[in-house]
Amino acid sequence: MTIEIANAAYNAGDFEKAFELFTQLANAGNADAQTSLGYMYQNGQACEKNEAKTLELYTKAAEAMQPYALFNLAILYENGIGGVKHDQFKAFDLHLAAAEREVPPAMYEVALMLERGLGCMQNFSEAAFWYEEAAKRGHLEAFNNLGVLYKEGHGVVQDERRCFICFSRAAEGGLAQGYYNLGLLYDQGFGCEQDHDKALDLCRKAAYAGHEKAKQIISELQAEGKIVF
């Protein structure tokens, strides 16, 4: 019995078999299995939801520095859920440990916390570093937020072209905020040639993707009779 067999059962949707195998492996001290079993308890897969078991398993695995246990535990502390009190400082430390172990969403969370000074000293240059690390691994929100830093010159030298590239990548991935921000660049001619038609098209895409400000703009343009749809 190996973690690979347990993972295969889980990925095939055989949660009962996966739960049984993860339990055996977790009891034997396998940190990957502890993490997966904690996730199953958290989501009630082949078992009743159990916050205490989830916390116990994530904590054990995090002590062994299992990357996703660190990240999942950080989310609990960040939001004050799962039987723990809200603790931004603990959340930051756990996210940072996960980020250092190549977990892209943890890299993004570390960057976001550094940018806002949540659970740590505000540091725009460190935020830019971690946004870039997450973006390199395809994290769309990281591309978008890095683009904002390049646009405003926070933590990095202001760079119109890099800003445009970052927003473009976020938009290519279908991120509503990416569409909206890229549309603003085309509207302003920031990092690209001004193109109001492209700006409007991107604003529409953002609206269709659920962006509230874009919806408002499109609605106002329709009401004014400037566009049909």
Region annotations inferred by a language model:
Residues M1-S36:
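N-terminal segments that cap or nucleate solenoid repeat domains
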Residues G13, N27-N30, N43-Q45, E63-P67, ...:
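Short helix-capping/linker turns of helical repeat alpha-solenoids
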Residues T2-A9, S36-N43, C47, L70-N79, ...:
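Hydrophobic face of amphipathic alpha-helices that form TPR/SEL1-like repeat modules
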Residues K205-F229:
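Terminal, low-structured helical/coil segments at or just beyond the last alpha-helical repeat
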Residues Y10-E16, N50-E51, D87-Q88, N123-F124, ...:
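Helix-turn-helix repeat elements of alpha-solenoid scaffolds
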